[in-house]
C-alpha cells in the first residue's frame, strides 16, 4: 500500500493490461494498487466500478492500523474520491465475498484471494 498506490510504472502496466482486454484482480489492501491508475482517456480505472476494500471504520478503529495514522491514506475514501463504488463488510453480505465489475475482480478479505483467482480465470476463458 505504501509503495504501489503512486508507482507510475505499476500504474502503466495495470492500465495497459486492462485496456488490452485483460483482467485485474486485487485482495485485501491490494486495492491500493489500482486506486490511482488512470486509463488513456484520463479517467480513473476504478471510476464507476464496484471495488472491494477495507472500510474506513476498520482502518480507523483497529490498533494494528494505529487508528488509521499508520496508513498513507484510507483506501475506501480514496476509491470513492476517484469515482469507485467502494464495497466492504458494511455493504456486502459476507466479508469474504468476491466483487466482479467489468474486468476487475476484488475482495476485501485476503484469505479470499484464491476465489479472486478463480473468478479471473473464468473471465479469461
Please identify what each model-predicted range represents.
Residues 1-25, 29-125:
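Active-site-adjacent pocket-lining segments in enzyme domains
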Amino acid at each position: 500500500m505504501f509503495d504501489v498506490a503512486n508507482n507510475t510504472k505499476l500504474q502503466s502496466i495495470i492500465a495497459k493490461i486492462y485496456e488490452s482486454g485483460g483482467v485485474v484482480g486485487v485482495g485485501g489492501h491490494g486495492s491500493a494498487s489500482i486506486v490511482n491508475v488512470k486509463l488513456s482517456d484520463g479517467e480513473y480505472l476504478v471510476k464507476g466500478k464496484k471495488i472491494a476494500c477495507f472500510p474506513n471504520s476498520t482502518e480507523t478503529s483497529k490498533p494494528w492500523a494505529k487508528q488509521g495514522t499508520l496508513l498513507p491514506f484510507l483506501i475506501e475514501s480514496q476509491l470513492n474520491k476517484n469515482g469507485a463504488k467502494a464495497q466492504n463488510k458494511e455493504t456486502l453480505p459476507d466479508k469474504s465475498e468476491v466483487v466482479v465489475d467489468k474486468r476487475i475482480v476484488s475482495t476485501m478479505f485476503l484469505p479470499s484471494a484464491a476465489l479472486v483467482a478463480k473468478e479471473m480465470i473464468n473471465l479469461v476463458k
